[in-house]
Curated annotation (Swiss-Prot):
Protein name: Dihydroorotate dehydrogenase (quinone)
Pathway: Pyrimidine metabolism; UMP biosynthesis via de novo pathway; orotate from (S)-dihydroorotate (quinone route): step 1/1
Lineage: superkingdom: Bacteria
Active site: S175 (nucleophile)
Record-listed E.C. numbers: 1.3.5.2
Amino acid sequence: MYYPFVRKALFQLDPERAHEFTFQQLRRITGTPLEALVRQKVPTKPVTCMGLTFKNPLGLAAGLDKDGECIDALGAMGFGSLEIGTVTPRPQPGNDKPRLFRLVDAEGLINRMGFNNLGVDNLVENVKKAHFDGILGINIGKNKDTPVENGKDDYLICMEKVYAYAGYIAINISSPNTPGLRTLQYGDALDDLLIAIKNKQNDLQAIHHKYVPVAVKIAPDLCEEELIQVADSLLRHNIDGVIATNTTLDRSLVQGMKNCQQTGGLSGRPLQLKSTEIIRRLSQELNGQLPIIGVGGIDSVIAAREKIAAGATLVQIYSGFIFKGPPLIKEIVTHI
């Protein structure tokens, strides 16, 4: 497979520049016959989750295609689902560059992107043009300049705009790169948010005559008590699923490595064990009442199987995809 050569060239570039270059090429081919260049035939392995049928259990995690620009090209690679976003009500530039760093030896990434995106209206226009036949998740967040106490308004605005076009909606309250965002995972703040989201979901179901499930994406840095509390809230408010996990602030496994001191969320192989442990504990607390989408450091068939063994119904990749390329998709879907 050609990817090792492509990777070598891309890794000569600054990480964000490499991402932009790759997406430039994918944008050129998306929706054209040239999509055949990235198309991979993978086996169909249907999985039912949140009332939806996924053609296989592997998805692309949020954060790679923030604006839904390359849905068809990414879909052609064999993913059963794509989660686009995180998108916010209004466009925003994100944090200052540089804001994305490779930890090559650890096969990890640190990012402090800060929800850079072109806004929810732009994303919806891109979704309307796409022909992806898998499940499309849309991950939503709040604008940086929206006070945390008004944060739920941003989620409701986004829900309203994406509802008609989403297979499921992911609520991102766990990015470490938007000040105060993670506080929405705790106690009354979480309950208030989930009540508002559930009410909005019911209203939108009545308007659109279809039920779009909602999943909440959580952090890997929750202590035992917080994890129990989150699980309890998700069950009490009849949320449809949970995505575990986002990136970590923990640097214990990458001490001494180049870029390890950069602020932001760490993903990739160093997150693998931590996210699997959260999935395992969450699975015990949820007791089969709520499906888990497992994400965090999946870079092989074994890593994907470990997530499923810990309690995940579906799995997603991001950093592993950057380091291993499209062959990882085929490998996981074939052997999972």
